[in-house]
Swiss-Prot record:
Name of encoding gene: tilS
Organism: Salmonella typhi
One term under GO cellular component: cytoplasm
Coiled-coil annotated residue ranges, if any: none
Gene Ontology biological process terms from the UniProt entry: tRNA modification
Record protein name field: tRNA(Ile)-lysidine synthase
Main location: cytoplasm
Amino acid sequence: MTTLTLNTSLLSSRRILAAFSGGLDSTVLLHQLVLWRERHPDVTLRAIHIHHGLSPHADSWVRHCETVCERWQVPLVVERVTLADNGLGIEAHAREARYRAFAQTLLPGEVLATAQHLDDQCETFLLALKRGSGPAGLSAMGERSPFAGTLLLRPLLRETRKTLEQWAVRHGLCWIEDESNQDDAYDRNFLRLRALPLLQQRWPHFPAAVARSATLCAEQERLLDELLASDLTDCITTEGTLRLSPLMSMSDVRRAAILRRWLAMRNAPMPSRDALERIWQEVALARDDASPCLRFGDHEIRRYQSQLWWIKTVAGQHETTVAWPVWQTPLALPAGLGTVQLVPGGELRRPREEESVSIRFKAPGLLHIVGRHGGRKLKKIWQEQGIPPWRRDTTPLLFYGETLIAAAGVFVTREGAAEDKEGVSLVWHA
């Protein structure tokens, strides 16, 4: 019986989605998973190929992968992704698009298997070292990682590229060669083609030694996670915001570790040391009467009520009006704000036949809301209700004609209150 080189101890799941580019590494992975399936008939195996459209050979690679999967009786999903310049660089953006497609393709109970190996681990470590990463970044890749509500497995992470080549030759496997892998303008290719061969010529076990260092860094991070768990519990609210008061008495090092872990929990990119310092100095310690904001790509960090918030950047809609001619159906909101819907059963009156329905994001004059005496301006109501400033011109306001009826999830006006049991509710799916 053929001895598999993949780490089968990872394969407790019986449903596996294998990332399959058609290159050497993923071909060996898929071949070994097919052999694993033969030994365990209860295993369900699928493959996914990502068509980036970057190479003129991309279509022929799809045909190659289809041929291989048909021969091995593995269902194949082909996902085409479009890459646009988002400032990350083509390598990072392609990876982001690839893993987004993986997440969308995974079925319930399925795990993702990818073909990274020991040489990849070494490259990842050195790239992190080049960026000046700390222990978290230098931990590189784990054999098992949380991903999209399931697991990402790397069963070949202990094997070298040479081992995979030997397996492929011995079993007569065919694979494709991506011409971009020979372009040393890409950092990873530079390491693989030029730097690592020199290092391995001098120190043959260099990749294995680097992998051990990555493992030690990962162990240090896990220990820190354990030691800081109580601090995190004290600092993080049920809304996922970060309380500032416990951080004030912490050392700089401890506070930075808490900030990093909070951002990781919010799925934010790992900040540099300079970025952490800016978060603390420019946002956390800003004047009490300020509304500080620090942008990170399409997200931002803000401070409100002595808490830090990690939020997606959304353009204010202060001047926007969205007509809702058929109010019985859901209405799509601008700027990715989601949808609103009027559903039966609630405390809002239905619109009269002559009243036009619209969604707006500002309301003039004094407003009289249910449960409050006297009139207030909208700004005062937002403050009383604890609505953060950045949500005040993106929270949908329901109007019948020129009359404000309700703010989604916040308040109902007296003019909008239902007088019978035929009321409706304004539901906002953000």
